[in-house]
Curated annotation (Swiss-Prot):
PANTHER family: FORMATE TRANSPORTER-RELATED (PTHR30520), FORMATE_NITRATE FAMILY TRANSPORTER (EUROFUNG) (PTHR30520:SF6). It comes from the Eukaryota. It catalyses: (S)-lactate(in) + H(+)(in) = (S)-lactate(out) + H(+)(out); formate(in) + H(+)(in) = formate(out) + H(+)(out); pyruvate(out) + H(+)(out) = pyruvate(in) + H(+)(in); acetate(out) + H(+)(out) = acetate(in) + H(+)(in). This is Formate-nitrite transporter. The chain crosses the membrane at residues 48-68, 79-99, 129-149, 186-206, 212-232, 258-278. Keywords: Cell membrane, Membrane, Transmembrane, Transmembrane helix, Transport, Vacuole. InterPro entries: Aquaporin-like, For/NO2_transpt, For/NO2_transpt_CS. GO terms for molecular function: high-affinity secondary active nitrite transmembrane transporter activity. Residues 1-47, 100-128, 207-211, 279-314 are cytoplasmic. It is a multi-pass membrane protein. GO terms for cellular component: plasma membrane; vacuolar membrane. It is found in: Cell membrane; Vacuole membrane. Residues 69-78, 150-185, 233-257 are extracellular.
Length: 314
């Protein structure tokens, strides 16, 4: 191999299973940078699709958890079984988003922010991507809540207590979500998006498909069962609760939950994770640029980085 063209040498084990920490950060920046090059309609379509996937799996999770909320069954297994089943079903949404390359706002708070900090996207591009992804996620999640969950009658309220367990499960979840104080909701949202952003980072780090699925599944399961607050999931759940006339109000939904959840999710991705990662690995990305060039814009799963060590002549 000619001088200056040798491959970047890493641990043989990591070649088979995972990237190094430096490579993971580089892939994260490149992934975030790539989003800035999509036209508005493409970004919106990808964001709507992600919102629909969250709605699909939140619907399934609510039905599955609601079946264990049947009043007689609840006396024997308790409400913890409903939470377990709900949390176990919901991570499928994130696997669908990864497989289709859809665009989720909460993951962008990490990836696109690292690209902004590395000056690979402008502030205007950053705001464009973040606002379109949030709006598209909202549109997809709320549309699914109305056209499928509400119009199908799956969460319809019944006067007969033996048939009302699905509605009651949704109602109790919604009431709990709007009962938090503003600060409590922000804190719960921070905890949530740490797990979600780590799930994105696992996809960028782990090369083995089964290992990636396993890691993402349990990262998302952890936040779902812990009762953390996720802005897109809450858009679906709380707007559906409004549609089926649960014990919630518009002002409580949007100002007591969705607003602080949005703030907390952003803090987690942009400040808790993106800023420290940038500080630790910013020079690794600069070294990568000097040896490789400007890189390429690829999808989350297909992004491939081949570092060259031309500076030391090895």
């Amino acid at each position: 191999m000619s001088k200056g063209k040798s491959k970047y040498v890493i641990d043989p084990i990591s070649v088979k299973t995972a990237c190094t920490s430096e490579e993971s950060y580089i892939r994260c920046v490149e992934y975030g940078k790539g989003k800035a090059h999509y036209p508005n309609l493409s970004l919106l379509a990808k964001a709507i699709l992600a919102g629909v996937f969250v709605g699909v799996c939140a619907h399934a999770s609510g039905i599955a958890g609601g079946h264990f909320y049947y009043h007689k069954l609840r006396e024997y297994v308790g409400i913890s079984m409903s939470a377990f089943v709900y949390g176990f079903t919901f991570p499928i949404a994130f696997l669908c988003i990864i497989a289709t390359g859809s665009d989720l706002f909460t993951g962008n708070t990490l990836a696109v922010t690292t690209a902004l900090l590395q000056r690979k996207v402008s502030l205007l591009q950053y705001l464009r991507v973040m606002s379109i992804s949030l709006f598209g996620n909202y549109l997809g999640a709320v549309s699914f809540a109305f056209f499928v969950s509400h119009l199908s009658g799956a969460y319809e309220k019944h006067t007969d207590v033996t048939k009302n367990h699905i509605f009651q499960f949704l109602n109790d979840i919604a009431e709990k979500k709007i009962s938090h104080t503003f600060i409590q909701c922000i804190c719960l949202a921070i905890g949530c998006n740490i797990f979600v952003c780590l799930a994105v980072y696992f996809v960028l780090t782990i090369k083995d498909g089964s290992g990636m699925v396993f890691s993402v599944f349990f990262a998302v399961y952890a936040f779902a069962i812990a009762g953390y607050e996720h802005i897109i999931a809450n858009m679906y759940t709380l707007n559906l609760a409004l549609m089926v006339e649960a014990k919630v109000t518009w002002s409580k939904v949007y100002f007591h939950n969705l607003l602080p959840t949005l703030i907390g999710n952003y803090i987690a991705g942009a400040l808790v994770l993106a800023c420290p990662l940038f500080y630790i690995y910013r020079n690794s990305y600069r070294d990568y640029e000097r040896t490789r060039g400007d890189g390429s814009n690829c999808g989350l799963r297909s992004l491939s980085i081949e570092m060259q060590n031309g500076s030391n002549g090895n």
